[in-house]
Amino acid sequence: MSETKTYCGFIAIVGRPNVGKSTLLNKLLGQKISITSRKAQTTRHRIVGIHTEGEYQAIYVDTPGLHMEEKRAINRLMNKAASSSIGDVELVIFVVEGTRWTPDDEMVLNKLREGKAPVILAINKVDNVQDKAELLPHLQFLGSQMNFLDIVPISAETGMNVDTIAAIVRKHLPEAIHHFPEDYITDRSQRFMASEIIREKLMRFLGAELPYSVTVEIERFVTNERGGYDINGLILVEREGQKKMVIGNKGAKIKTIGIEARKDMQDMFEAPVHLELWVKVKSGWADDERALRSLGYVDDL
């Protein structure tokens, strides 16, 4: 009896910051593995999300948003991670936002033109476009920019047409053995996912007040006798004022962040979690490549 053919390939999700790449990845996978926030530049590592359906396995690379400014070491590294993701994939999903077109979009497009992989153009947030009459000319403009494999208007938030993207992806996966067991959804460790969950809550509850100079280090991640996990998270900020902001009045802010992060961790790890958080000032970490290496920002470049 002949063996069933299997199909497997890597797909990069690219675009300028804050167009909805992480939301799209989470929808394609059916659960949350990439942090989402209304702030630009929330994805700092290339998260690999794995979706296996029967004989098809799609491995998604969620890049940081490519962007023009490269002043700080962390932004240079994020751009490098995004650019290197484009080079070694079977397919690219280029995410843009509604009828907006910016120099950053243009820069991403230029990088894609240099590549060999076919590109699906996903026009996100079309449900937010007020004047629908603007949409058709904009679609025609985008279609003339490059020979796209397909152009799909989507809403990553509501899931509109995300199944269309998934179907196109499946159709273009090469015949290959599956790289991961079928129950895997990410190759990232639980420790890494714990730090991402804490960072998402920081973004969510501190919003515009908090600059990007914040990161999370998991100092302890152990199983306990109750069948759950004891996790200690260290939140690193650059200035004393930021530390006070994270802690909040009488510790209220960090308590909320801890409670919400613990809930998400318990959902993800399917086990009880005991979480403790500390805040520490480590000035200049976002400018120091050595510090970034020690925090794991360049282990995947």
Swiss-Prot record:
Keyword RNA-binding: yes
Region of interest (G2), ranges: 41-45
Membrane-related topology note: Peripheral membrane protein
Region annotation G3: where it falls in the sequence: 62-65
InterPro entries: G_ERA_dom, GTP-bd, GTPase_Era-like, KH_dom-like_a/b, KH_dom_type_2, KH_sf_prok-type, P-loop_NTPase, Small_GTP-bd
Domain Era-type G: 7-175
Alphabetical list of Pfam families matching this protein: KH_2, MMR_HSR1
Top-level taxon: Bacteria
Region G1, annotated ranges: 15-22
GO molecular function per UniProt: GTP binding; GTPase activity; ribosomal small subunit binding; small ribosomal subunit rRNA binding
Amino-acid positions noted as binding GTP in the UniProt annotation, renumbered to this chain: 15-22, 62-66, 124-127
Ribosomal protein found in the keyword field: no
Coiled coil: none
Subunit relationships: Monomer.
Entry's family note: Belongs to the TRAFAC class TrmE-Era-EngA-EngB-Septin-like GTPase superfamily. Era GTPase family.
PANTHER family reported in the protein's UniProt record: GTPASE ERA, GTPASE ERA, MITOCHONDRIAL
Function field: An essential GTPase that binds both GDP and GTP, with rapid nucleotide exchange. Plays a role in 16S rRNA processing and 30S ribosomal subunit biogenesis and possibly also in cell cycle regulation and energy metabolism.
UniProt name for this protein: GTPase Era
Source organism: Cronobacter sakazakii (strain ATCC BAA-894) (Enterobacter sakazakii)
